[in-house]
């Protein structure tokens, strides 16, 4: 396969992972609670943050398979990717211009930025079979995730330094630095998306169609594929299992920083843990794929599920920053591996000519899973904070009761 296309494709993970680290997992949850929302009521902030994540996931889940079918019919994978990436980039830039106390606007902009991020990932994933073959698809998938962790880790370190030492960057205070951190994510995302847009070629499996014809034929294809899915037992079984275990993974990714903040850890400690996850995950993902190739991809997923069960169990007992860093280390060991193997295994069992549509179903179930975890986490926090005086105990319970990875 063309190495330029492989690295151009993988570099998009480097580009958009800045949103996942700096915005989604890092600064937005804390900034939303302390600047845009009410800093005296963390439980309410957690609830609205979980609700926002769930709304974004639900919208993407409903659109994913239909847009995937349309993209397959009209060879619109790259076009749809660019559209959603543009939406995410613009909304992320917009986070840097929202005034204090404007939590409804901040939440709405965050929802749209998350839709852009998640929507683009559908079509990014669907291009994986186009830039790889049966021999290297596992390594290419792992390369994307590992570069994502490295790129996200580099930018969050820069952003953390900006917020910790704003004067050195010519900024007034940490608030201004945080807003510029959001802007830097948008710029980073846009800049490193360019190679994919220029060098990754999208194969055509159908005759060229107008957008209107692609919509009509795509809807017909979606209906037919949905019916055929009942006959494809391997794909259907995998999707069901994926729906069950990815919820735990997504909930930990999206809500870990807010969980740590609720436990009373300071921002520096939380950011240090996020950087640790990124750096460990960069190496762990590349190693994990080698282990999975040795023991089998299916067993590799089982190993990741077991790892996340241990992580969630350990999270219940977190009391000190040392405990939190141990949990962060464990997350880094398993997070990228289970995501990468899931993607590459799924690519092996679906027809390439319908990759966008099938990845639509893949992302639909992933997003439906992400609907329940964050909103359950926020709801449990809100409920327990009203009946338990010890905020730390409430935080422990909400993590433990969020859906854990299962098979």
Language-model features: where?
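Helix-loop boundary and gating motifs at the non-cytosolic
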Residues: 2-57, 236-241, 245-263
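Juxtamembrane intracellular "pre-TM" segments in multi-pass secondary transporters
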Residues: 3-6, 203-238
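Loop-to-transmembrane helix entry/capping segments in MFS-fold secondary transporters
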Residues: 43-46, 134-144, 267, 352-362
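Central cavity-lining transmembrane alpha-helices of secondary-active solute carriers
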Residues: 51-67, 276-284
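Helix-to-loop junctions at the C-terminal end of transmembrane segments
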Residues: 64-75, 284-296
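Structural signature of the two symmetry-related core transmembrane helices
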Residues: 79-93, 300-313
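Helix-loop junctions at membrane interfaces in 12-TM secondary transporters
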Residues: 97-108, 316-327
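Conserved small/polar residues in nucleotide/adenosyl-binding loops
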Residues: 400-407
């Amino acid at each position: 396969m063309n190495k330029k296309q492989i690295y151009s494709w993988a570099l998009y993970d480097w580009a958009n992972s800045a949103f996942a680290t700096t915005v989604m997992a890092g600064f937005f949850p804390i900034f939303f609670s302390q600047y845009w929302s009410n800093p005296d009521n963390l439980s309410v902030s957690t609830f609205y943050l979980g609700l926002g994540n769930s709304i974004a996931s639900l919208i993407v889940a409903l659109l994913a398979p239909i847009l995937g079918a349309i993209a397959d019919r009209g060879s619109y994978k790259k076009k749809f990717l660019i559209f959603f990436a543009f939406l995410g980039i613009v909304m992320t830039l917009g986070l840097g211009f929202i005034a204090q106390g404007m939590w409804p606007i901040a939440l709405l902009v965050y929802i749209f930025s998350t839709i852009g991020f998640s929507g683009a990932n559908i079509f990014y994933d669907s291009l994986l079979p186009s830039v790889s073959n049966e021999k290297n698809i596992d390594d290419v998938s792992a390369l994307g995730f590992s570069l994502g962790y490295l790129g996200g880790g580099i930018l969050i370190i820069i952003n953390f330094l900006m917020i910790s030492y704003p004067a050195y960057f010519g900024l007034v205070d940490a608030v201004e630095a945080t807003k510029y951190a959001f802007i830097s994510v948008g710029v980073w995302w846009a800049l490193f998306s360019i190679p994919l847009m220029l060098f990754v070629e999208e194969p055509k499996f159908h005759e060229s169609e107008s957008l209107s014809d692609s919509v009509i034929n795509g809807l017909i294809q979606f209906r037919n594929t949905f019916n055929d899915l009942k006959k494809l037992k391997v794909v259907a079984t995998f999707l069901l299992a994926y729906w069950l275990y990815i919820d735990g993974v997504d909930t930990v990714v999206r809500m870990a920083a807010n969980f740590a903040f609720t436990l009373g850890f300071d921002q520096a400690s939380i950011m240090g843990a996020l950087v640790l996850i990124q750096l460990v995950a960069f190496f762990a993902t590349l190693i994990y794929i080698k282990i999975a190739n040795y023991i089998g991809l299916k067993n590799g997923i089982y190993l990741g599920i077991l790892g996340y069960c241990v992580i969630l169990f350990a999270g219940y007992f977190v009391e000190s920053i040392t405990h939190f860093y141990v949990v962060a280390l464990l997350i880094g060991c398993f997070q990228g591996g289970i995501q990468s193997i899931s993607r590459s295994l799924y690519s092996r069992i679906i027809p390439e000519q319908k990759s966008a549509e099938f990845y639509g179903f893949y992302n639909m179930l992933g997003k439906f899973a992400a609907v329940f975890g964050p909103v359950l986490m926020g709801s449990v926090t809100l409920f327990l904070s009203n009946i338990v005086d010890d905020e730390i105990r409430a935080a422990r319970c909400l993590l433990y009761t969020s859906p854990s990875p299962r098979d």
